[in-house]
């Protein structure tokens, strides 16, 4: 009898221990889910109440520089790393650059709060220097791969457009899906035919390059778009192509036109030079010249928490995840109660 009683008592104690463990884990999961949902609601509300920043593209505008020459900067692929952006924007603000061409992936996630956070950062760090952008894949793709340009258009304006500065025509294109559709290529063809003759030089800037000199079959335009793009720009007076997406600096040529790909300014570096950077250019009567790529050190003071708060935390999938975690916690609580019976 004593042996049987001891065995029964030991079993009850073990069930009691496991019941307590399940109860504790269930409470932790429920509490964690409620905290995440509460934080998400607070962050969404705080960012939506923030001062809305807009960096609308100067579509069709014609700027006249005070002198015969001017400087401009070009950057790409920030992602969610605030610290390199701060250093790069500070460098540009102190330089002679009249404006910045940003060729995509300024953000990491496509949601209003993250766009707003990055816009606030740029406005604070860049000051009065204008930023003119074209979309990258991160601006138009959701986490599950759905293409939507509406948020980008609201903050930055059209995906493709032209403007001029002095004797230079700048044409921004939307290569965010690694392709150009018929409508955009027809627009480019008409722009080069009607607008290009009014200016001495022409620069085309876009996110995805037509070719990738390091990995020929990756991170470039799809074959059909690449070939059609070449047909449109060949022998049309285009003087320079500027792209990003590949996360390294390179100089090459496409369709008889010089092509420069920009270093990453925050996303993972794919270069022997383990630094983030941008490129400075000078335009004068002799043409458009690359001055130099400018690199900054990759420090450790990255504001990942702010980036997470404005991006991943406010993603709609967080709500579904929190519901599942909450339900799991409830199940564990009931499991613990059953074990006590």
Tell where the protein language model's regions lie, with residue ranges.
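Juxtamembrane low-complexity tails/linkers enriched in Ser/Thr-Pro and polybasic
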Residues: 2-15, 308-314
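N-terminal Sec-pathway targeting helices
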Residues: 6-30, 319-323, 334-341
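N-terminal active-site segment of His-dependent metallophosphoesterases
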Residues: 23, 33-117
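Extended active-site neighborhood of metal-dependent phosphoesterases/phosphodiesterases
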Residues: 42-66, 112-202, 217-240, 248-285
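A short C-terminal boundary segment appended to hydrolase-like catalytic domains
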Residues: 44-57, 253, 279-341
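Residue-level marker for buried hydrophobic side chains located in beta-strands
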Residues: 72-74, 100-102, 133-134, 204, ...
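Active-site glycine-centered loops adjacent to acidic/histidine catalytic or metal-binding residues
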Residues: 77, 104-105, 136-137, 207, ...
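Short active-site segment of divalent metal-dependent hydrolases/proteases
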Residues: 80, 107-108, 139, 210, ...
């Amino acid at each position: 009898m004593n042996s049987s009683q001891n065995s029964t008592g030991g079993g009850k104690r073990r069930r009691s221990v496991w019941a307590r463990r399940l109860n504790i884990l269930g409470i932790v999961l429920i509490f964690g889910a409620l905290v995440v949902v509460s934080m998400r609601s607070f962050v969404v509300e705080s960012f939506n109440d923030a001062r809305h920043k807009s960096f609308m593209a100067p579509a069709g505008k014609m700027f006249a520089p005070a002198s015969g020459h001017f400087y401009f900067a070009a950057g790409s692929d920030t992602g969610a790393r605030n610290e390199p952006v701060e250093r790069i924007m500070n460098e540009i603000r102190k330089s002679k650059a009249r404006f910045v061409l940003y060729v995509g992936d300024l953000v990491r996630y496509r949601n209003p709060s993250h766009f707003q956070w990055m816009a606030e950062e740029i406005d604070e760090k860049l000051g009065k220097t204008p930023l003119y952008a074209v979309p990258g894949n991160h601006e138009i793709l959701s986490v599950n791969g759905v293409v939507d340009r509406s948020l980008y258009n609201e903050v930055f304006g059209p995906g493709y457009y032209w403007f001029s500065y002095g004797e230079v025509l700048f044409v921004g294109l939307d290569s965010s899906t690694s392709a150009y559709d018929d409508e955009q290529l027809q627009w480019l063809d008409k722009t080069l035919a009607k607008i290009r003759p009014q200016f001495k030089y022409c620069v085309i800037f876009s996110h995805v390059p037509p070719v990738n000199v390091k990995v020929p079959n990756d991170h470039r335009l799809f074959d059909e778009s690449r070939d059609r793009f070449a047909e449109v720009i060949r022998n049309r007076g285009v003087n320079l192509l500027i792209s990003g997406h590949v996360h390294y600096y390179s100089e090459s040529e496409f369709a008889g036109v010089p092509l420069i790909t920009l270093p990453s300014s925050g996303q993972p570096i794919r270069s022997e030079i383990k630094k983030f950077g941008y490129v400075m250019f000078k335009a004068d009567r002799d043409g458009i010249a690359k001055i130099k790529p400018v690199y900054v050190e990759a420090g450790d003071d990255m504001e990942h928490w702010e980036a997470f708060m404005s991006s991943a935390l406010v993603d709609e999938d967080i709500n579904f995840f929190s519901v599942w975690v909450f339900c799991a916690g409830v199940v564990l609580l009931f499991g613990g109660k059953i074990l006590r019976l």
